[in-house]
């Protein structure tokens, strides 16, 4: 006898699990199908002794109310990211390496030699606030003109050519793609979603990396899975979503790569747009949604975690954060657990060309380059870690990269943006790429689940009213 679910959620990352969590609390018969052999999606906490390191998404801030509320509900505690001390800046044409205390009341962009980007920040604010991404129009002159330009091209057109080097770095750090590869309209969309540009560069209590979850960000998924129990399955890669073949036309038939078949009334897909090309849809997706799956790309990042037996950088008055135009690590952070059971620094190698270059090297060559870079910042103790861990998210079959899906120059946002979330029959869409708030962040994933749950609840009420 066929089991008919109210809703099947495809994807067991944060957005999928939170969607399932809320629907189950509303007495829906739900099932989560996750393609991987683990839950968590683009979050992945690795146990190290009595502690952990996060190989995926790990930060939240005070401007992330939905994620903070969920942590409270799941009885998860957070702690402050360590920023006490000096930040290293390796961003100067003369090769000098300087350090500044970002918590100083006198600290600003001028002090570190980046005063020239202040006018650009103001321009970005002025232009960005005039774009309403919730009401994209295919005829919008400002959208069409901006989307044809990359970030680098727009800077040159506006007379800010001297800032291109900074924004090549900045885009790699914020969206894991070069400013030569993404449209300025997409950049505005991202900046608007996180409430401004400054919090991505200067670290304080208002920044995007202000707090962490004790036990690791995967604890969110673990707690939800323990609530869902048998209502979630691993190793279930969905290959077909069929809305037309079942004898009862209101049901959706879902088939996995193992030829397992499930039936439901509604589907929530949290698959990133660019990975939808691996799924057959009957009937096919509208042309705009097809463009999203075919033309969007994922950012590229290698997350490097170096574990030490002491916090020698803190002992010297540094906070473990570095900003570098040189690399291979373009940005690093203190990555210690709250109880110092694991003492580590994380760093990021971001961007398509950077990943291509560094993955042409051996693991030992990458390791040596990273440790030598750290030794220039914090001394010879950086050369002797007890563990060196890499996670190249571009090699992850079910993510195809990190941090988020990005858009090239062209017209995909102006023509297709409204189709990110528009249901296709009984298929609804969630995931951080569908969120207008905190796009690409864990908060964006949770926000998207809130929206899609409301959609499902309204659909359910309408269905009942017809009976």
From Swiss-Prot:
Signal peptide: none
GO molecular function: monoamine oxidase activity
Classification via Pfam families: Amino_oxidase (PF01593)
Catalytic activity field: a secondary aliphatic amine + O2 + H2O = a primary amine + an aldehyde + H2O2
Positions bearing S-8alpha-FAD cysteine: 402
Family: Belongs to the flavin monoamine oxidase family.
Lineage, top ranks: Eukaryota, Amoebozoa, Evosea, Eumycetozoa, Dictyostelia
Species in which this protein is naturally found: Dictyostelium discoideum (Social amoeba)
Protein name: Probable flavin-containing monoamine oxidase C
Keyword Oxidoreductase: yes
Cofactor: FAD
Gene name in the database record: maoC-1
Superkingdom to which the source organism belongs: Eukaryota
Enzyme class: oxidoreductase
Statement: the UniProt record of this protein carries the keyword Flavoprotein: yes
EC number: 1.4.3.4
Listed transmembrane segments: none
SUPFAM superfamilies reported in the protein's UniProt record: FAD-linked reductases, C-terminal domain, FAD/NAD(P)-binding domain
Keywords: FAD, Flavoprotein, Oxidoreductase
């Amino acid at each position: 006898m066929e089991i008919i679910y109210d809703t099947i959620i495809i994807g067991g990352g944060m957005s999928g699990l939170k969607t399932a969590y809320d629907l189950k609390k509303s007495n829906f018969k739900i099932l989560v199908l996750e393609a991987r052999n683990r839950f968590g999606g683009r979050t992945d906490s690795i146990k190290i002794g009595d502690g952990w390191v996060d190989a995926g998404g790990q930060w939240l801030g005070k401007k992330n109310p939905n994620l903070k509320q969920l942590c409270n509900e799941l009885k998860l505690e957070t702690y402050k990211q360590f920023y006490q001390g000096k930040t290293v800046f390796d961003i100067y044409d003369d090769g000098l390496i300087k350090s500044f205390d970002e918590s100083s009341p006198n600290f600003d962009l001028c002090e570190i030699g980046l005063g020239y980007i202040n006018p650009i920040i103001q321009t970005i604010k002025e232009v960005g606030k005039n774009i309403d991404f919730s009401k994209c129009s295919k005829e919008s002159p400002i959208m069409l003109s901006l989307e044809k330009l990359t970030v680098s091209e727009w800077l040159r057109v506006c007379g800010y050519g001297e800032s291109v080097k900074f924004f090549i770095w900045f885009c790699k750090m914020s969206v894991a793609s070069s400013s030569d590869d993404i449209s300025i309209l997409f950049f505005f969309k991202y900046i608007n979603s996180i409430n401004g540009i400054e919090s991505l560069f200067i670290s304080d209590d208002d920044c995007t990396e202000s707090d962490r979850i004790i036990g690791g960000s995967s604890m969110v998924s673990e707690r939800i899975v323990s609530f869902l129990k048998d209502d979630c399955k691993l190793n279930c890669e969905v290959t077909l979503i069929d809305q037309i073949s079942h004898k009862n036309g209101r049901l959706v038939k879902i088939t996995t790569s193992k030829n397992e078949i499930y039936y439901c009334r509604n589907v929530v897909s949290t698959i990133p747009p660019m990975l939808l090309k691996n799924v057959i849809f009957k009937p096919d997706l509208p042309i705009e949604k097809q463009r999203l799956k075919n033309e969007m790309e994922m950012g590229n990042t290698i997350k490097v975690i170096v574990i030490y037996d002491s916090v020698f950088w803190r002992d010297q008055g540094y906070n473990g954060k570095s900003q570098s135009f040189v690399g291979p690590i373009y940005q690093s952070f203190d990555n210690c657990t709250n109880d110092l059971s694991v003492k580590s620094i994380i760093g990021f190698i971001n961007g398509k060309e950077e990943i291509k270059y560094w993955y042409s090297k051996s693991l030992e060559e990458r390791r040596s380059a990273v440790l030598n870079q750290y030794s220039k910042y914090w001394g010879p103790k950086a050369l002797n870690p007890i563990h060196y861990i890499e996670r190249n998210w571009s090699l992850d079959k079910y993510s195809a990269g990190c941090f988020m899906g990005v858009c090239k120059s062209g017209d995909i946002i102006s023509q297709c943006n409204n189709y990110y979330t528009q249901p296709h029959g009984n298929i609804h869409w969630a995931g951080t790429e569908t969120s207008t708030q905190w796009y690409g962040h864990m908060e964006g994933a949770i926000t998207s689940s809130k929206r899609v749950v409301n959609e499902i609840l309204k659909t359910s009420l309408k269905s009942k009213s017809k009976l």
